[in-house]
């Protein structure tokens, strides 16, 4: 027995939900679209799992964070899918895919065929066993990738109040889970091999400010070392962790966040794999024209930097999903996916956003002493390529986004750039209007050339310099095509 659909989305994470919403808005007919997911629930916003889901009071629970509430859009409950004629095949694993025949075989033995396939399989959490450490199956060792993981972690947290937790990893999951554990009145020690937290993105100066705040909340840091083994009680529950530097840490709970690996195994040998993900073009189309890939599993061209990237963040998942559906449903009017890499996080009283690429010379600016509002620029080969801001307003975040998208030449020295701070970004934007990047660029969009910014007088955050006169053609373009870019 088998079923046939025009469109099949394989995977049930964030990207799948946003793709489904885009399909309905582009006129998909009842019965044409199917979503196949190993999870037993409809697509949901994964960021909630390390934040609201772990709160000790009034924690977030489904259906409150089904997609697409994370972008202030519709909440896609199971009823929504039914009302729109979308087939949800949940709790089902696909054990093989035949790209040439355009078929999928489920673990139940059902064959599902498609005309177009969107791969939204995401990624899996790396396990300690892959690094030679046994014991991940202990009841108080927790990962956090899906709803089942979150439920397990929440249960262990409830039984560990005033106890000791060891968080392995200093990235997104480690930092956000550590904050949640503190809120739950658990003593936290973070362990990671790098010199500072969020090493792939933060500079040492930025990291030190966040680490100092965490320390003030009682969090301890052990850096430059790794976990080597666990100690267990008679019930095979972890009681302590041993580190390579000889440290011995008591543990009632262990949270592991040591990275992810894209779920590409079904397509290896059938589609081109690059940088760990499925290689796609600027329309999110793989080496097979009927197969698209979106979200964490996709390696796509980032036009701003002229190279292939695989990005692990919810914003990329949301926007790549919309673009892939646009390319399938309206190929003539859909242009290239012109994505500006974007990362953000909210922990304790902090809220930061980053745009672009954290490479090149770093210039810090703002009020690092009080930790309320500060930022950084990354300058590579004389151009602005990355911007970070903590504690900004919505308008300030939009400004650094637009400035980074322009990739302007920096003609002032770095010391002056530090003094200018946010004023530099304001000047970039005021001197040259940016055709704001749409979630789904149209084929008619014209790529604007990089701007050159020359600043003669110091500026302050609240005083944007007077913009230069923009050519009439550019002004007309901005009028017709410019519209506010959504950041949430």
Curated annotation (Swiss-Prot):
Disruption phenotype: Conditional seedling-lethal phenotype due to the unability of the seeds to break down storage oil to provide carbon skeletons and energy for early seedling growth. InterPro entries: FAD-oxidoreductase/Apoptosis (IPR050446), FAD/NAD-bd_sf (IPR036188), FAD/NAD-binding_dom (IPR023753), FAD/NAD-linked_Rdtase_dimer_sf (IPR016156), MDHAR3-like_C (IPR048618). Keywords: FAD, Flavoprotein, Membrane, NAD, NADP, Oxidoreductase, Peroxisome, Redox-active center, Transmembrane, Transmembrane helix. It is a multi-pass membrane protein. Its EC number is 1.6.5.4. SUPFAM superfamilies: FAD/NAD(P)-binding domain (SSF51905), FAD/NAD-linked reductases, dimerisation (C-terminal) domain (SSF55424). Its main location: membrane. NAD(+) binds at residues 170-176, 194, 200, 259, 312-313, 344. FAD binds at residues 12-15, 39, 46, 51, 145-146, 296, 314, 344. Residues 25-458 are peroxisomal. Catalyzes the conversion of monodehydroascorbate to ascorbate, oxidizing NADH in the process. Involved in the detoxification of H(2)O(2) that escapes the peroxisome and causes oxidative damage to oil bodies. Belongs to the FAD-dependent oxidoreductase family. This is Monodehydroascorbate reductase 4, peroxisomal. It comes from Arabidopsis thaliana.
